[in-house]
């Protein structure tokens, strides 16, 4: 996807900050529904509302259906072949593809100010390859959506140690919850020294994934149907089988006046082993239809998790006015501390019956959880933190001494002629000298702007301080 014709950042005389995003694809068959794609799209949209000095170089699998959602003048998509098998992505790193998208030898891509890695397993590969190829080693911000905990993984070679290595190379690493951070630190003690675990502790912090302000409903639907929603993944780590066998089946035995909507339950499972469960509905909708159906539901259920992650399924319901009963655990209390919690399966059955029978209570809880989302869980509330962290990490990059002759000569050359990165580098020093401190000094120099013209990113002299 090409940058639009007009020159990005030129008219504002800004020094544009560039962020290279490394992906973590887990839903290859429909990238529009992939959690990473949705998350980075939200970040781009929300940051664009509060600042106009960021340009995103976004790496995505070579599929066309997601390009349209990133049609912004400050985004460029670089599409490369990508494994469809999740475990293969853990070790996937094609240096020839990286060289192609970074235009190695063309000098048109290398002024990156921050690497935003969503796959910490690949971070060492990135800094090793790009650091040796480039004159420039930018700092790293990581967002880990997943860790290969031993209590979850049933494959032979989990990537937990490589994930921790990637975190250690970052300036900061976001995880979904404080509970998840504690799981990482606890398991890391089995493999690493106390000093290394302390390093992880200093770098990892929770980033509670917000919802889009414009997708939050103004009010609840007070005329709901007797539908219980389980909109989580139907996996063991989401306690799915126990929820069905120990909560939903017993509830159906007691009363047959409700349905359970499980949109992520696949048709193969339904047809082969679920025919006797007449209460199950696995109808799938597009995004608008999904939200519309959530508004009709009486209550949702959020299960025990082995992963202690943030539950987007729960916030999806809450922002549409559907209250959720939640397993009594810290990771749900981080999400919504004022909800109804169950400590065992019998308690879950009791709570579900209360919501099915007492619509007035249900509506009160739905309104409470909706108001909590509006006040605490929207991007309007959270985007300033992300913006601050990006600025802080870039600002803390070491800068070159602007009083030295090398920098003074560099500025004089830019003053005499607007220069591309190739021109800046090729006439000045060899490959052993890194460009990073010079890039930072130019960024901090109010006389210099950096923008995208029709063909290249260029440095331009704008006058005295």
What spans do the regions from the language model cover?
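Conserved catalytic-core segment of nucleotide-activated headgroup transferases in glycan assembly
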Residues: 39, 212-215, 223-274, 281, ...
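Active-site proximal beta-strand in glycosyltransferases
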Residues: 114-116, 129-151, 167, 173-175
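Acidic donor-binding loop of glycosyltransferase active sites
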Residues: 292-309, 322
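Short His-centered aromatic/hydrophobic patch
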Residues: 117-123
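N-terminal subdomain of nucleotide-sugar transferases
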Residues: 1-65, 73, 249-253, 427-431
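A short, active-site helix/loop in glycosyltransferases that binds the activated sugar's phosphate group
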Residues: 166-201
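A charged, aromatic-enriched C-terminal amphipathic alpha-helix characteristic of glycosyltransferases
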Residues: 38, 360-399, 432
């Amino acid at each position: 996807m090409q940058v639009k014709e007009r020159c990005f950042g030129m008219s504002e005389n800004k020094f544009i900050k560039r962020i290279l995003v490394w992906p973590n694809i887990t839903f290859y068959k429909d990238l529009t529904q992939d959690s990473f794609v949705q998350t980075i799209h939200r970040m781009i949209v929300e940051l664009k509302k509060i600042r106009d000095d960021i340009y995103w170089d976004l790496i995505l699998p070579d599929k066309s259906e997601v390009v349209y959602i990133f049609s912004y003048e400050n985004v460029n998509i670089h599409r490369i072949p990508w494994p469809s098998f999740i475990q293969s992505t853990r070790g996937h790193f094609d240096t020839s593809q990286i060289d192609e998208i970074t235009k190695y030898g063309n000098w048109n891509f290398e002024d990156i100010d921050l690497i935003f890695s969503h796959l910490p397993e690949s971070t060492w590969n990135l800094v090793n390859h790009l650091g040796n190829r480039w004159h420039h080693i930018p700092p790293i911000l990581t967002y880990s959506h997943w860790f290969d905990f031993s209590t979850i993984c049933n494959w032979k070679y989990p990537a937990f140690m490589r994930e921790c290595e990637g975190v250690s190379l970052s300036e900061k690493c976001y995880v979904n919850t404080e509970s998840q951070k504690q799981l990482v630190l606890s398991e890391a003690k089995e493999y690493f020294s106390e000093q290394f675990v302390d390093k992880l502790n200093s770098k990892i912090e929770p980033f509670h994934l917000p919802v889009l302000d414009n997708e939050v409903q103004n009010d609840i639907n007070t005329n709901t149907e007797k539908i219980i929603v389980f909109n989580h993944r139907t996996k063991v780590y989401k306690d799915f089988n126990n929820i069905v066998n120990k909560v939903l089946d017993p509830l159906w035995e007691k009363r047959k006046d409700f349905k359970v909507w499980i949109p992520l339950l696949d048709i193969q499972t339904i047809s082969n082993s679920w025919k006797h469960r007449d209460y199950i509905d696995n109808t799938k909708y597009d995004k608008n239809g999904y939200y519309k159906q959530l508004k009709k539901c009486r209550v949702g259920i959020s299960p025990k998790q082995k992963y202690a992650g943030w539950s987007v399924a729960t916030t999806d319901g809450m922002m549409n006015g559907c209250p959720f009963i939640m397993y009594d655990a810290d990771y749900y209390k981080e999400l919504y501390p004022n909800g109804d919690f169950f400590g065992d399966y019998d308690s879950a059955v009791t709570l579900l019956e209360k919501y099915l029978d007492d619509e007035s209570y249900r509506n009160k809880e739905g309104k409470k959880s909706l108001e909590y989302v509006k006040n605490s869980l929207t991007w309007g509330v959270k985007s300033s933190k992300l913006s601050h962290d990006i600025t802080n990490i870039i600002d803390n990059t070491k800068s070159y001494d602007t009083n030295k002759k090398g920098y003074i000569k560099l500025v004089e050359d830019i003053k005499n002629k607007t220069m591309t990165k190739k021109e800046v580098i090729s006439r000045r020093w060899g490959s052993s000298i890194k460009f990073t401190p010079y890039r930072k000094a130019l960024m901090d120099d109010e006389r210099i702007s950096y923008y995208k013209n029709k063909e290249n990113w260029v440095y331009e002299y704008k006058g005295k301080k």
